[in-house]
């Protein structure tokens, strides 16, 4: 099955090669380097990256699944779920941040914007405070008397679970 999918994905390439044609923009974009991704990442209180050109890849958690972004990524708009964003810099450094929620926009010009509701570096997280918060959120969920209170407690618990995973598996 996988072989059939792989063969079918090459059909367009083979047709274009035989006819001497190319996809518009493919050659132009293939010459671009990692420095061509302009990356901005901010929360209401902190700007982590502002149109940074030293980023070669960003890995993000979204409600439609986790995915990596490289230069020339297809344009996309996604909603962030609680989790870890990993920024791979051109010099080989990887920086990790926890985000509670937010949005990510990838534009056709390889610019990427992440706007987080809340964000911090992983070293700012306190394991004990996370465990206490998770216990309180679980108790709030059990004692919630309205749908709104249940939803609020459920969201808090989901965020604390993601925080705990970030601390346990950086």
Question: Residue locations for each model-derived region?
Answer:
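N-terminal mitochondrial targeting presequence
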Residues: 1-36
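Generic hydrophobic segment detector
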Residues: 3, 11, 71-80, 149-154, ...
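Compact, glycine-rich, soluble single-domain proteins
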Residues: 40-132, 136
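Acidic/glycine-rich phosphate/pyrophosphate-binding loops and surrounding catalytic core
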Residues: 120-170
């Amino acid at each position: 099955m996988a072989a059939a999918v792989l063969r079918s994905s090459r059909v367009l390439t083979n047709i274009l090669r035989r006819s001497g044609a190319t996809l518009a923009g493919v050659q132009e974009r293939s010459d671009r380097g990692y420095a061509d991704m302009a990356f901005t990442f901010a929360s209401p209180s902190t700007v982590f990256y502002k149109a940074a050109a030293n980023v070669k890849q960003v890995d993000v958690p979204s409600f439609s699944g986790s995915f990596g972004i490289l230069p020339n990524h297809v344009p996309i708009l996604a909603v962030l779920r609680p989790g870890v964003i990993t920024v791979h810099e051109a010099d080989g450094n990887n920086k990790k941040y926890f985000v509670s929620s937010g949005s990510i926009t990838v534009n056709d010009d390889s610019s990427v914007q992440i706007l987080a509701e809340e964000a911090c570096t992983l070293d700012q997280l306190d394991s004990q405070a996370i465990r206490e918060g998770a216990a309180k959120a679980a108790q709030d969920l059990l004692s919630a008397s309205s749908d709104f209170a249940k939803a609020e407690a459920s969201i808090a618990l989901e965020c604390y679970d993601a925080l705990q995973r970030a601390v346990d598996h950086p």
